[in-house]
UniProtKB/Swiss-Prot annotation:
Lineage summary: Bacteria, Pseudomonadati, Pseudomonadota, Gammaproteobacteria, Enterobacterales
Gene of this entry: katG
Assigned keywords, A-Z: Heme, Hydrogen peroxide, Iron, Metal-binding, Oxidoreductase, Peroxidase
Binding site for heme b: H267
The protein's enzyme class: oxidoreductase
One GO term of the biological process aspect: cellular response to hydrogen peroxide
The protein's name: Catalase-peroxidase
Location of cross-link Tryptophyl-tyrosyl-methioninium (Tyr-Met) (with W-105): Y226-M252
Task performed by this protein: Bifunctional enzyme with both catalase and broad-spectrum peroxidase activity.
Catalytic machinery residues: H106
Transition state stabilizer (site feature) positions: R102
Self-association and partners: Homodimer or homotetramer.
Modification comment: Formation of the three residue Trp-Tyr-Met cross-link is important for the catalase, but not the peroxidase activity of the enzyme.
Length: 726
């Protein structure tokens, strides 16, 4: 412990006592608030990817920059790069095709259809944790190989687009005809913090396939893209991997045929690397010393590169033409008998026991080896359903080529949203069901049409609560991760959304709005639903004494039922929507955490979320018409009463039961129950960050600001899927 003498002594020597010692004195060092309170609400997730982290500035327009790109010149440069072997990371057989295909695959393969997060859309492979995942060993080298090309073309091509395009060019240069390529992935400049990669604290912790159905996780082990190539938990049993493969690829939105095509296609080119024990491999990029300059996994085995490279620890080459597209994967799979063996690193794999040595060595032309396969490759032969598909592809290579081309396109574009977001000269013309296609607009309402429609809606007999609820139900399905959902298409009127419990009250307004649409003869139901919300908000603001114009951008269209994949749209059904005080399940997370999750999917900031919840409550927009959180005697009036009464110390809150999901607010003097609330309500008084925002809106001078902020956030949500307005 320091004494006054210690301080005097250091002062006498001219040294500041506070600059002594080994404590971390840097910004952000020391014990953090999350160390003290690990369950603290993650409001910070709503502040990701702001302009403060973007070196390009808020005026940068990627689509505009991309239009200046010499696209085919870029592809030519990528093609040349494939065979320009570098001594610091020599190319197998003189080609980086397999490496770039793996880079693209592993960038896109993190996508999870259950919550729309992950995927290649923002170039997240550059950042932790993905840049240092065990399954991404050596992909740091692939990205570094691409740097001269990225440097040459600058901001005309994003890293996110370049990763996927490099994979496409690698396939094409190997003799494969791809389905196409859509650009439009914009880079971000920091890791995504909202993606739940799992609770495990150790890499490669095994997960049971059944558990994947209960959580938004894509892989069966922490740190893998899909499954353990040695079988579940290193079982070495091909058949036991079938359930894990189905669960993982299913979470990416793939069926059995797409799964077989992707595994076989991805393993037609290139190899795995396991020249020696993985104990020779150094720390990953995030843990590597500063002089490594962002590279990781430096190996001390031999030269550490080329023939001595160690990546997964497996040493497998599937085909005899590993740099040229072929059907050899299936031919070898069924032609030979396979015996379990181990790689030089000790990993479980299989070798064709009755095959001649027909596989070329990647660095010594005088050497040959027998075909080898991963445990999970053999699953395609021994699982009955996978085997049927695999034999069909064996006997019909063109069917395999077509299936892989489409599955690869789906894999690499799954998180980009509708086709209208794609840019570039190689965008396929065909509409695909997983893109949630929409018909072309045939009519855009005039200003007079909009005025007439607003009058019709206002005179329809629908209340403010009903008008606001139906518009929110339509628009709030949007997911910022994969750009799915939203009001465009009016899929609220279609299956499955029309039957969701959360929409039970909201859809009661649909017959009235459908009648207005029919009488108008021109406007889309999608536009009318959003316009209903406009009318509701304007009426509520007027009732509060404010004349507010809610901006409305027409041009939405109505999807057909045959353009709507019911199974995939079921994934958009919320397990909770705190904006409507809805929660279907109590076995996942807390209500307030799920509110943050929903707000983050809607790309809302903390103030936007706060304004919307406060407004939705006083407008009576709870999914079931309950009074929870309706802290006002003027339902339907756009007031700041929610905040005023929430922060009023006259009321004391107590849980109604042990679940602590619902609460009663009693007058401290009389004991009378004045209000009821959910956790999604009380969090705005409990959480210190959200309370700070709520205090702004509860202030005596804040009513007009609150209304304006609510309207701005409301319009943002209504237009989240209007990519045509960008």
């Amino acid at each position: 412990m320091s004494t006054s003498d210690d301080i005097h002594n250091t002062t006498a020597t001219g040294k500041c006592p506070f600059h002594q010692g080994g404590h971390d004195q840097s910004a952000g060092g020391g014990t953090t608030t999350r160390d003290w309170w690990p369950n603290q609400l993650r409001v910070d997730l709503l502040n990701q990817h702001s302009n403060r982290s973007n070196p390009l500035g808020e005026d940068f327009d990627y689509r505009k920059e991309f239009s200046k790109l010499d696209y085919y010149g870029l592809k030519k440069d990528l093609k040349a790069l494939l065979t320009e072997s570098q001594p610091w990371w020599p190319a197998d057989w003189g080609s980086y095709a397999g490496l770039f295909i793996r880079m693209a695959w592993h960038g896109a393969g993190t996508y999870r259809s259950i919550d729309g997060r992950g995927g290649a859309g923002r170039g997240q492979q550059r950042f932790a944790p993905l840049n240092s995942w065990p399954d991404n060993v050596s992909l740091d080298k692939a990205r570094r190989l691409l740097w001269p090309i990225k440097q040459k073309y600058g901001q005309k091509i994003s890293w996110a687009d370049l990763f996927i395009l490099a994979g496409n060019v690698a396939l094409e240069n190997s003799g494969f005809r791809t389905f196409g390529f859509g650009a439009g992935r914009e880079d971000v400049w920091e890791p995504d913090l909202d993606v739940n990669w799992g609770d495990e604290k150790a890499w490669l912790t095994h997960r049971h396939p059944e558990a994947l159905a209960k959580a938004p996780l894509g892989a069966t082990e922490m740190g893998l893209i899909y499954v353990n190539p040695e079988g579940p938990d290193h079982s070495g049993e091909p058949l036991s991997a079938a359930a894990a493969i189905r669960a993982t690829f299913g979470n990416m939105g793939m069926n059995d045929e797409e799964t077989v095509a992707l595994i076989a296609g991805g393993h037609t080119l290139g190899k795995t690397h396991g020249a020696g024990p993985t104990s020779n491999v150094g720390p990953d990029p995030e843990a590597a010393p500063i002089e490594e300059q962002g590279l990781g996994w430096a190996s001390t085995y031999g030269s550490g590169v080329g023939a001595d490279a160690i990546t997964s620890g497996l040493e497998v080459v599937w085909t005899q033409t590993p740099t040229q597209w072929s059907n050899y994967f299936f031919e070898n799979l069924f032609k030979y008998e396979w015996v379990q063996t181990r790689s030089p690193a000790g990993a479980i794999q299989f070798e064709a026991v009755d095959a001649p040595e027909i596989i070329p060595d990647p660095f010594d032309p005088s050497k040959k080896r027998k075909p080898t396969m991963l445990v999970t490759d053999l699953t395609l032969r021994f699982d009955p359903e996978f085997e049927k598909i695999s034999r069909r592809f064996l006997n019909d290579p063109q069917a395999f080529n077509e299936a892989f081309a489409r599955a690869w396109f789906k894999l690499t574009h799954r998180d980009m949203g509708p086709k209208s977001r794609y840019i570039g000269p190689e965008v396929p013309k065909e509409d695909l069901i997983w893109q949630d296609p929409l018909p072309q607009p045939i009519y855009n309402p005039t200003e007079q049409d909009i005025i007439d429609l607003k009058f019709a809606i206002a005179d329809s007999g629908l209340s403010v609560s009903e008008l606001v609820s139906v518009a929110w139900a339509s628009a709030s399905t949007f997911r910022g991760g994969d750009k799915r959902g939203g009001a465009n298409g009016a899929r609220l009127a279609l299956m499955p959304q029309r039957d969701w419990d959360v929409n039970a009250a909201a859809v009661r307004a649909l017959p009235v709005l459908e009648k207005i649409q029919k009488e108008s003869g021109k406007a889309s139901l999608a536009d009318i639903i959003v316009l209903a919300g406009v009318v509701g908000v304007e009426k509520a603001a007027s009732a509060a004494g404010l004349s507010i114009h809610v901006p409305f951008a027409p041009g939405r269209v109505d999807a057909r039922q045959d353009q709507t994949d019911i199974e995939m749209f079921e994934l958009l059904e919320p397990i909770a929507d705190g904006f409507r005080n809805y929660r279907a399940r109590l076995d996942v997370s807390t209500t307030e955490s799920l509110l943050i999750d929903k707000a983050q999917q809607l790309t809302l900031t903390a103030p936007e979320m706060t304004a919307l919840v406060g407004g939705m409550r006083v407008l009576g927009a709870n999914f079931d018409g309950s009074k929870n959180g309706v802290f006002t005697d003027r339902v339907g009036v756009l007031s700041n009463d929610f905040f005023v009464n929430l922060l009023d110390m006259r009321y004391e809150w107590k849980a109604t039961d042990e679940s602590k999901e619902l609460f009663e607010g009693r007058d401290r003097e009389t004991g009378e129950v004045k209000y009821t609330a959910s956790r999604a309500d009380l969090v705005f008084g409990s959480n210190s960050v959200l309370r700070a925002v709520a205090e702004v809106y509860a202030s005596s001078d804040a009513h007009e600001k609150f209304v304006k902020d609510f309207v701005a956030a409301w319009v943002k949500v209504m237009n989240l899927d209007r990519f045509d307005l960008l």
